[in-house]
Amino acid sequence: MANVVVVGAQWGDEGKGKVVDIYTEFADDVVRYQGGNNAGHTLVVGDEKIVLHLIPSGILHKGKRCIIGNGVVLDPEVFIREITNLKAKGKFQDDGVLLLSESLHIIMPYHKRIDIAREAKSGAKKIGTTGRGIGPAYEDKIGRRGIRLMDLLDKQVFTRKLKESLEEKNFLLEKMLGEKPFSFEEIFDEYSAFADTLRTYVADTTLVLHQDLKAGKKLLFEGAQGTLLDVDHGTYPYVTSSSTCAGGACTGTGASPRDINEIIGISKAYVTRVGSGPFPTELEDADGEKLRQTGGEFGATTGRPRRCGWFDALVIKYAVRVNGLTGIALTKLDVLSDFETIKICTGYSYNGKFLSELPANLDIFEKCQPVYEEMPGWQTDITAARSFDDLPEKARTYVKRLEELAGCPIVLVSVGPRRDQTIMLKNPFEA
């Protein structure tokens, strides 16, 4: 038996969707453990591109149980729209394989309005939020005033909690943010209708997980965003509002740390970031634009162009450390195929000092300059490679150098967006 956690090892958008899609073949359950619809997983199935924001990627595989855990914040409208779209495409028909934790928190309309209004007032201090209400929903969760799915399903409880919440939220919207307040009726009627649809999928998912673990089933835990966006371990305050690291797989589902066997970090062969915050290897030149266009680096959720830069070994070393990575899945190696020279950041220069580890102090991090090592590019198409030996020697040398710098084995190399454009060096489910 092997249970595997998949985490982003950079700032998100590393290609987790494709890797999870591949690993799902070997799992019985696929479990989403944090975040909300601020994340977008892009999958290419045949010639069709499918983008999922909430539902685990495993939904595209027949016979796999998909669970959205208690660590997720759920926008009911988005969830229902995803189900409807998947059913219309013939990708999902069995409601019994999709479960929602009764304990997860619900994103309300006022969360979204507050999110957008705050960002608009932030000026130069913008975080780069997606405006989906994720942060305000987690605020209510931590403040012990959130509305959970089990509350939404009980009209009496929902009525009481919504009235209490609106009293506070409308004051905030009107008096502090200058925004229009909400009426009780408009939210209650809309969300009561959502509840009727959601009821089909609700379960005590922690109990289900432990029953499946006891039965010897294999679990795949699917994270969203990336390590450097973790609320505790990321580049705070330029982070998301949940625990994106491997530890979140336990707190966000009810699984025990003893149940986790392998932790795979997903990393691009270069680096991207969306929104504000430090990014030492960012390229604001022709090379950066080339990475963006060749890699299709535009957000699956927002459509925003991603900031692009060279591979940063310090970021990956940090991800290995705080997640306890047992392997790295390297994605988008093919995007580098047209570069004559490829750079790797092996350290930072700060005030005349050489830094070999990621600084925790944001003021220092923002002033760090990358120290590069240059490697020759392979300048040939690698999308047909299906084994490591199929890669050009210079591409193999590049991968081995990244592995050496990370201090963690690379267990998968992706050379294109399709499922079959993958070189699996080691299967974590067979470890």
From Swiss-Prot:
Q: Give any Pfam family that matches.
A: Adenylsucc_synt
Annotated GTP binding lies at 12-18, 40-42, 306, 332-334, 414-416
> Which residues does the record give as Mg(2+) binding sites?
13, 40
Q: What is its main location?
A: cytoplasm
What EC number(s) has UniProt assigned to this enzyme? 6.3.4.4
Gene Ontology CC annotations of this record: cytoplasm
What role does this protein play? Answer: Plays an important role in the de novo pathway of purine nucleotide biosynthesis. Catalyzes the first committed step in the biosynthesis of AMP from IMP.
Name of the molecule in the record: Adenylosuccinate synthetase
- To which species is this protein native? Geotalea daltonii (strain DSM 22248 / JCM 15807 / FRC-32) (Geobacter daltonii)
